[in-house]
Amino acid sequence: MSHSSKAILLRYGEDMEGIERLANLSEVWVSAGSPLQTPAEIAKGIKTWIRDIPEFKKFFFSLPPEVDRKYVRDTVSNCRLTFAERFIATMVWGYGNVGYGPYRVSKMLASENLDTKLSISWGLAREGAALDAYNYLKDNRIEQLGPAFATKWLYFCSDEPVEIPIYDSVVARWIGEHAKEHFAGVPISSEYWSANTYSRYLNFLSKASQLTGLKAGELEYLIFLDAQSN
């Protein structure tokens, strides 16, 4: 680790827990060529998606057998698609072949004023207003959409270089193991909406970004990799 990186860690003091681990993970990842996440295989479950959401059958058939983060980001940025289609692409990536996913998403799609909620949250995310976008969906709920999958939607809505990071159960578990001191006084769980928790998470990743030079989405991915390997 460079002298400047060590100086940043010293400045953070007790908040360095977790940040130093991310710094070490980033060095390994970058030296390995920054490999991308393995695409999510969705072909096996596509019939269930079509069964539970038949009105989007044509869209489901347009999806490739595997989807990665770049594919979903490009899809969510495609203004020729409806907001519902863009949202579905995110949920398919998030749930993959999990059996209950299509049913839950069918309930989300039936939510009142869905198009308005998706378009407003998309716009806030494109502006890089992470906490505003999070709070909007917290205050204007989409049925069955909790904060974990809401942040997946916001992540793909956000435009590089500003990335709105995912905060799901995998991230929350890693935080509890490696960075809980930074989250003192706020709930760590991703199951419940908490602007304080998400704000603390954004602050944590901002500090890690200053140290590593990586974007928030890249740091979240490293957290995901580290959590999955343990």
Specify the residue positions occupied by each region the protein language model found.
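Generic detector of solvent-exposed, compositionally biased contiguous segments
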Residues: 45-82
